């Protein structure tokens, strides 16, 4: 008797099967090529734009700076026999949270005192100040509405 006829062809050993599966195109079947690690430049996907580094990384309001006390040196009050000692700086670094509760100095303009540092940035957006009321100086019968 003859051996039984096999319906399916025998599978290739695993090493050769893997080589056959990595053939990229049927026309390249002559030499077994694995797919390239990097496709050529035209087929690569474009890289997303890199986040730009900021030229000014933090605004001045976000930077915490130590507040130094004013140096008090009054040479008039000293006696002639006394030697002037260098001023002792006992600075306590106040963080930004403590500074927010302090009142601004009196000599600052009202806009800066009311709005803080952001008031200088918003100053150009504020409405123009109204002209002083002139209805008392020249009452005219043709103007019914006063400018103020």
Curated annotation (Swiss-Prot):
Belongs to the Epstein-Barr virus BLLF2 family. Keywords: Early protein. Residues 38-57 have a biased composition (Basic residues). Residues 1-86, 122-148 are annotated as: Disordered. Residues 134-148 have a biased composition (Polar residues). It comes from the Viruses. InterPro entries: DUF5451 (IPR035221). This is Uncharacterized protein BLLF2.
């Amino acid at each position: 008797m003859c051996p039984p006829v096999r319906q399916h062809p025998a599978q290739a050993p695993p090493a050769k099967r893997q080589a056959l599966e990595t053939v990229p195109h049927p026309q390249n079947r002559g030499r077994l090529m694995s797919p390239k690690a990097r496709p050529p430049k035209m087929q690569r996907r474009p890289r997303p734009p890199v986040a730009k580094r900021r030229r000014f990384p933090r605004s001045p309001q976000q930077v915490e700076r130590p507040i130094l006390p004013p140096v008090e040196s009054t040479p008039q009050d000293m006696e002639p026999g006394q030697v002037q000692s260098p001023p002792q700086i006992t600075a306590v670094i106040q963080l930004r949270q403590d500074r927010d509760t302090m009142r601004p100095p009196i000599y600052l303009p009202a806009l800066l005192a009311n709005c803080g540092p952001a008031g200088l940035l918003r100053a150009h957006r504020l409405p123009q100040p109204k002209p002083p009321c002139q209805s008392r100086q020249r009452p005219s019968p043709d103007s019914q509405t006063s400018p103020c």
